[in-house]
Curated annotation (Swiss-Prot):
Residues 1-10 have a biased composition (Polar residues). This is Pentatricopeptide repeat-containing protein At5g48730, chloroplastic. It is found in: Plastid, Chloroplast. Keywords: Chloroplast, Plastid, Repeat, Transit peptide. It comes from Arabidopsis thaliana (Mouse-ear cress). PPR repeats lie at residues 149-183, 184-214, 220-254, 255-290, 291-325, 326-360, 361-395, 396-430, 431-465, 466-500. It comes from the Eukaryota. Belongs to the PPR family. P subfamily. Residues 1-28 form a transit peptide. InterPro entries: Pentatricopeptide_rpt, PPR5-like, TPR-like_helical_dom_sf. Pfam families: PPR, PPR_2, PPR_3. Residues 1-22 are annotated as: Disordered. GO terms for cellular component: chloroplast. One of its GO terms (molecular function) is mRNA binding.
Length: 508
């Protein structure tokens, strides 16, 4: 790996140059591995929390009288905070509904307040509610005070690109021209993004050539970076090289974002030679230096591939060159150590985060909950699940999948029932991956009635089983020797279309 260091100092395994905060925040955690000792966080006399390693033959949850009092006090506080949060949430919802009601009632009115309409439009653009956003935009154009604004058009076109609506984006582009707006390179870049995000590369290239032939709308590094990212997402690496060559001919030099996009894509594709070559090119640029995104992409590439030693070496070199880690860095380290079964080092990262008061995100909780679930430490997993809720971090579908998988491995069908009851009392948006995890968990426990019941639950929630669903059921029946059921499902598997499931990766 190329050296990144700009100094002769040797970086420690975890950074030590961050100033300790005055306010303490205690997170109790125990790392347990079937082959590793039990690790617990304890507090010393100087109030600096640390992780002490305590070896035990069995996983034990240590609770004394002080812990009970502390827990009761915390539960009262959590209940109070929950009520306050609920009142605030209701207040926000009521304000939004009032705004929506005003917009709906005054359709056709030409005297709405600018702030009311613009805030409503901004809210819908941010939430990617493209149909509603277009409706509000049409209402905006009817107002007496309306004047065409290029910035609003650009935001709408970018939103439509993210929502895979290139035709609508093109319609807005034409309307913008009809209204007399001056089309600049930012508008063209937004439309290029809309085309490329939907895989309409021919249209994107046609627009790129039009930009190159114009005098005042020349493509810039941002335009090329968007195209490069779109091609990398479909693994069209040859097209990426063509774009890089075209950039050089145009006299456009890649920036840090361009290089980071390439490094991240090569890492995900496990093309480590190309990834390192790109990093070397980046280091050769005078005005293009690696940053935390560069470090995180590199660490994720090696850590995700199980190359823990290489990941640690890269971490040291990046840090010795002056690049500070952030919460995403630690999430990557936790995920890599957890999946490789190195709970000792995972605990060291948790200790460091606690010592220097890095606030945990939902990704952090999802990573450690999954790790403890894999290790079979259900008590610690459940403690973290409660803790994230007390910290007002609402569980996601990823969180629930980790819980269901862990309970399935431990044959805790009643616990899975608890997860389902939790879902019924929440507004978590489920996905097909969750239901497939549920099928797998019941299949492992030979709970075939409950496994079939998942299909009914899927239909109730508006989901259709895919090939993964049925293949998981076939596997469970085959292991139990239920050949009749296996034969019945084989025909169903072949008749079902290929799975269209997009697994959301952690936002490291």
């Amino acid at each position: 790996m190329v050296s990144l260091s700009t100094s002769t100092s040797h970086a420690p395994p975890l950074p030590t140059n961050r100033r300790t905060a005055e306010r303490t925040f205690t997170v109790r955690c125990i790392s347990i591995s079937p082959r590793e000792p039990n690790y617990a966080i304890t507090s010393d006399k100087s109030n600096n929390t640390s992780l002490s390693l305590r070896e035990t033959r069995q996983s034990k949850w240590l609770i004394n009288a002080e812990d009970v009092n502390e827990r009761d006090s915390k539960e009262i506080k959590e209940d109070k905070n929950t009520k306050i949060a609920s009142r605030k949430a209701i207040s926000i919802i009521l304000r939004r509904e009032a705004t929506k009601s005003i917009i709906e009632k005054k359709k056709g009115s030409k005297k709405l307040l600018p702030r009311t309409v613009l805030e409503s439009l901004h809210e819908r653009i941010t939430a990617l509610r493209w149909e509603s956003a277009i409706q509000v935009f049409e209402l905006l154009r009817e107002q007496l005070w309306y004047k065409p604004n290029v910035g609003i058009y650009v935001k709408l076109i970018v939103m439509l690109g993210k929502c895979k609506q290139p035709e609508k984006a093109h319609e807005l582009f034409q309307e913008m021209i009809n209204e007399g707006c001056v089309v600049n390179h930012e508008v063209y870049t937004a439309l290029v993004s809309a085309y490329s995000r939907s895989g309409r590369f021919d249209a994107a290239f046609t627009l790129l050539e039009r930009m190159k032939s114009s005098h005042n709308c020349q493509p810039d590094v941002h335009t090329y970076s968007i195209l490069i990212k779109s091609f990398l997402q479909v693994f069209a690496f040859d097209k990426v090289q063509d774009l890089l060559s075209d950039m050089r001919r145009q006299g456009i030099r890649p920036n840090t974002i361009t290089y980071n996009t390439l490094i991240d894509a090569y890492g995900k594709a496990k093309m480590f030679v190309e990834m390192e070559s790109t990093l070397i090119q980046m280091l050769g640029e005078d005005d293009c230096k690696p940053d935390s995104w560069t470090m995180n992409s590199t660490l994720r590439a090696f850590g995700g591939n199980g190359q823990i030693e290489m990941m640690e070496n890269c971490y040291e070199k990046f840090q010795s060159s002056g690049i500070e880690p952030n919460i995403r860095t630690f999430n990557i380290l936790l995920d890599s150590y957890g999946k490789s079964g190195n709970y000792k080092k995972m605990s060291a990262v948790m200790e460091y985060m606690q010592k220097y008061h890095y606030s945990w995100t939902i990704v952090t909780y999802n990573v450690v909950i999954d790790a403890f679930g894999r290790a079979g430490d259900l008590k610690q997993m459940e403690y973290l699940f409660r803790l994230m809720q007390s910290e007002r971090i609402f569980p996601s579908c990823v969180t629930l999948c980790s819980l269901v998988r862990a309970y399935g491995r431990a044959s805790k069908a009643d616990k899975i029932g608890g997860v389902l009851r939790f879902i019924e009392n929440s507004d978590i948006r489920l996905d097909l991956v969750f239901f497939n995890c549920l099928v797998d968990a019941y299949g492992r426990m030979e709970k075939f009635a409950e496994m079939k019941g998942v299909l009914e639950l899927m239909e109730k929630k508006g989901f259709k089983p895919d090939k993964i669903t049925y293949r998981t059921m076939v596997k469970a029946y085959r292991i139990s020797g239920m050949t009749t059921h296996v034969k019945e499902l084989h025909g169903v598997v072949e008749s079902v279309g290929e799975a269209q499931v997009v697994v959301k990766k952690p936002d490291f």
